[in-house]
Regions:
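Bacterial N-terminal signal peptides that target proteins for export
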Residues: 2-10
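Bacterial N-terminal signal peptides
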Residues: 10-18
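Glycan-recognition and processing domains
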Residues: 24-63, 74-78, 99, 105-116, ...
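Extracellular and analogous surface-interaction loops
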Residues: 55-66, 125-131
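Short edge beta-strand/loop segments characteristic of extracellular beta-sandwich folds
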Residues: 69-73
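Beta-strand-rich ligand-recognition modules
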Residues: 76, 90-149
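Short coil-to-beta strand junction motifs in C2/discoidin
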Residues: 78-87
Length: 149
């Protein structure tokens, strides 16, 4: 293939990449999201919300793909892997039990809780269809500390 064909292919790929609608944003809870935890991850401040006993509530308009990024706090002296759980309730009827087990990541720090370390992130994806959806995140009874999302 000659150089003209390569340039047309590259131009087409660049055009497709820039015209495709890619968007990612942090969703704030519509209910019970007053308490926040700021973690320092790779020298950047990241905002997390703890899942307490009353849970977190979100209202989302679809179609969309949601990614739940969670971490679990542990005391600095603990070095082994830790398991943590939480529950996702979609539209008040469908329940998803999410279980993670991750090791402690040494590079993450908290401004509010300097004596804690945090696990590697546990990611969970949900695809939502068109329409308005309510999502409720609930704490598992087995977790000693609140899961951060």
């Amino acid at each position: 293939m000659n150089q003209t064909v390569y340039s047309k292919i590259i131009s087409f790929l660049i055009l497709v990449i820039f015209l495709s609608p890619l968007e990612a944003k942090l969703l704030k809870p519509s209910k019970n999201g007053e308490e926040k935890e700021i973690l320092i991850v790779n020298s950047k401040r990241r905002l997390y919300y703890p899942i307490k006993s009353e849970g977190l509530h979100y209202s989302v308009k679809g179609p969309t793909r949601l990614e739940f990024i969670t971490r679990y706090p542990v005391l600095k002296k603990k070095k082994q892997s830790h398991s943590f759980q939480y529950h996702i309730i979609l539209n008040g009827k469908d329940t998803v039990d999410v279980n993670h087990r991750y090791k402690v990541q040494k590079t993450i720090k908290s401004v509010q809780h300097p004596k804690h370390k945090y696990t590697y992130s546990g990611n969970y994806f949900i695809n939502l269809e068109k329409g308005v959806h309510t999502i409720e995140l609930l704490k598992s009874n087995e977790s000693k500390y609140p899961v951060l999302i």
